[in-house]
UniProtKB/Swiss-Prot annotation:
InterPro entries: Pacifastin_dom, Pacifastin_dom_sf, Prtase-inh_pacifastin. Belongs to the protease inhibitor I19 family. This is Serine protease inhibitor I/II. The keyword Secreted applies. The record marks 48-49, 86-87 as: Reactive bond. Disulfide bonds join 23-38, 33-51, 36-46, 60-75, 70-89, 73-84. Coiled coil: none annotated. It is found in: Secreted. It comes from Schistocerca gregaria (Desert locust). It holds the Pfam family Pacifastin_I.
Length: 92
């Protein structure tokens, strides 16, 4: 059980996504709230943190819920703001 938990924790901490863009080994960059490092083979490997969404204008009926990708949002009392879950949605 401890081994399974340790493996899950390690997996969550070290989940990497390789971008299609080529790079120079050793380079680093930020992508939203994630950090990317260029691997020795010249491809980007980035963490996959669930970044807070960028603020944007919304128009919704106060108190209602709606989906934003895989996240659920609740419309604020002003009808112009919403609070959403921060799941890391799988890319399609």
């Amino acid at each position: 059980m401890k081994l399974a938990l340790a493996l899950c924790a390690a997996f969550l901490l070290v989940v990497l996504v390789q971008a299609e863009q080529e790079c120079t080994p050793g380079q680093t960059k930020k992508q939203d709230c994630n950090t990317c490092n260029c691997t020795p083979t010249g491809v980007w490997a980035c963490t996959r943190k669930g970044c807070p969404p960028h603020k944007r204008e919304v128009t919704c009926e106060p108190g209602t819920t709606f989906k934003d990708k895989c996240n659920t949002c609740r419309c604020g009392s002003d009808g112009k703001s919403a609070a959403c879950t921060l799941k890391a949605c799988p890319q399609k």
